Every structure is written in C-alpha cells, then in structure tokens.
Amino acid sequence: MKKILLTSLILLSFNTVGEIAPEIKALKDTPKSVLFIGNSYLYYNDSLHNHFKNMANERFAKFDGSKNVKSATIGGSRLKHHDVERLIQPRAISSIEKFDLVILQGGSGEVLSESDRIEFGETAHQHIETIRSKDIEPALYMTHAYTESHKDYAPNLIRSIEEMYTLSGNTNQVLVIPVGLAFEAAYKERPDMKLHKLDGTHPDLLGTYLAACTVFASVFGESPVGINYDYNGSVSAEDKLFLQKIAQLTVNNYYGLSGSD
C-alpha cells in the first residue's frame, strides 16, 4: 500500500509539474565525512570525490578528505543497482564507522520515460529511508544532460532532469545538488567549452571540475571562488575561475540565494 501511494504521488507530481523550486536549500549539518554513490559520471577523470576532497582540504584546515571522503561506483548503474544498506554499515568502506552525508547519483537513462522516472522516484525514496535509518543525511546529485553526439540527446532534456530530481528532493525533503544546471549554465556562457567526452554523456575533466565545485558550494554553503586547486595544473587559471563562478551562480539561482559570485 505504501508503495502504491508513493507511485501515485510521483505520477501526480510529474503530471502537474510547472516551475518548481527546491524546498531544501542547505544541509542540516556540515559534514565531516561524505560518501558518493553512483556510476561512471562520478569515477571519470580521477573520480569526482578526489577533486571535491582536495578543494575541501584546501579551504578547511581541519577537514581530512583523504580519510573521510569515499566513493562507491558501478559503471552504467542506476540507483536500483546499489546495495546502499551494505555500503553504509560501520567499516564497510575503509575504517569509517558512520558517514555524515551520503550523496546519491542516478543513472542518466532514469529520466527518459515515465516508467524510468517512477522507478527512480521509488528507489530514491527507499535509499533515502535506509540512509536516514542510520542517522545519516542523504542528498541527491542532479546529473547533466547529454550533448548532441549522444543518441538520446534532446534539447530540453535538462528540464526533465531538473524536474525529476527537484520533485524527488521535495518529496523526500533532501538537498538536491544542481550539477546538471551548472553544465547548462557553463555551456550558455561558453559554448566552446569541453565539459563532455566525445560520447556526449560522460564528463571530461572540466565537467568533473565543475561538478566538484557545485558539490562543494551546495554541501558547505560556501563559494568555491578563489580555491587554488587545479588538479596539478591541468585546469587553466581562466577555466578554473570561470567554473568556480558558474558553480556558485548556479547554486545561488537554484536555491534562491543572494550572492555576488
């Protein structure tokens, strides 16, 4: 009965959606440990969690990302493929007893049909309940859209992605990290920038850097602008500043916050 009610709510939400805004605009507490769960969107380019932890290590003197930021990924996976309950058990990953924050990243195809979106909504709810049962805060990672070289490209796909993640975030009262909207904003400003691989789906290095900046701004509630980390010189000073500003602007716009960056 509970599943039927949840499915009905998801269907009603998608059928009546107009412009929606996220209801949760910040985490309850600043995390000291973070687990990313997802697929190749996370592990490409030396893994997003490594870039995120290097940014956090630089900005926060007492943050120990090497010890407390981890990633569990399966190539090509959707949310349903992850055994979240096992991953968040004490010492299931390294020596960490309990993560403060678990970030869930869904598969890119989970937005392509109504049945896919319903399954995403149901699975996200199940995982979020599992995470909360361990007194861990959950969050959702909004994925980016495909580019034209991908067979499933559609000009307005990002709107469907935005709606699906925002609705799920509001339904479950969790923070949504607007990575997909940051990609959209960056391409609007600099259409020539290479955020995707040639396959039109996976992130290139600059896309991963932008995603890490967006996660940083969302999770910590602080601007990434001014962070020196550039992946050992692999991100130019111009691109670094541009992506940092885009990430913060996207977060401000999505959460309805004020800010000059």
Predicted regions: what they are:
Residues 195, 202, 212-261:
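Conserved catalytic region of serine esterases and O-acyltransferases that act on ester linkages
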Residues 33-35, 42-121:
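Conserved SGNH/GDSL esterase-like catalytic core that processes O-acyl groups on lipids
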Residues 49, 53, 121-128, 162, ...:
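Extracytoplasmic/secreted envelope proteins and their assembly/folding machinery
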Residues 91-205, 217, 226:
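Alpha-helical cap/lid subdomain in secreted, periplasmic
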Residues 37-38, 141:
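Short hydrophobic segments within beta-strands
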Residues 13-15:
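N-terminal signal peptide c-region/cleavage motif recognized by signal peptidases
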